[in-house]
A protein has these predicted regions:
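A solvent-exposed interaction/effector surface
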Residues: 1-171
């Protein structure tokens, strides 16, 4: 269920876990960015929610959107139930699509340290970090009622045999 402000009421418990979303059906909406900062983020979230509603698709976690940033273009990803919709925005995520999750009790201004720690943990396990996805669990309207700012950080990774050889096993 989606709250009145647009935030997800329920979200997956992916804190400090590895998740494989490979083969999951997703609605992917490209969004404009400027220096990795989304432009009109709320309006694109609303547009994506409206498109999913018009297509009569069912989200796995209603209201939860993953945002991937880029210098000038990013994307919003919402996981949906398997669908045979002819929409050009419905795609299946590639296999493998390994992610390391981290529930950060803060907003975008304080994610530097947890992202760095997550990256070091992945490197210690012989995994190469790839792109970073953000999912805002709370917004500026509901964070006080829901226990403060919460941001789900998801770092995509791939196994690296070369890196595994270089990393000494922890005893």
């Amino acid at each position: 269920m989606i709250l009145e402000c647009g935030c997800p009421e329920h979200y997956p418990d992916w804190h400090n876990q590895d998740i494989d979303l490979g083969g999951q059906c997703a609605h992917i909406l490209p969004i404009p960015m400027l220096a990795h900062m989304p432009m009109s983020y709320d309006s694109y979230l609303h547009k994506q929610r409206e498109e999913i509603g018009l297509l009569e698709l069912k989200e796995r976690w209603p209201g939860m959107a993953l945002m991937a940033t880029g210098a000038f273009r990013g994307k919003l990803i919402r996981l949906i139930e398997n669908s045979t919709s002819p929409s050009r925005r419905i795609e299946y995520l590639p296999r493998p699509f390994q992610l390391r999750g981290w529930l950060h009790p803060g907003d975008i201004g304080s994610i530097r340290t947890p992202v760095h720690e997550m990256q070091l943990d992945l490197l210690d396990l012989g995994r190469t970090p790839q792109e970073l996805y953000l999912s805002y669990i709370t917004c500026t309207r509901c964070y006080e009622q829901r226990g403060g700012h919460k941001t789900l950080l998801l770092r995509r990774w791939v196994d690296s045999p070369t890196l595994k050889k270089r990393v000494k096993p922890l005893a």
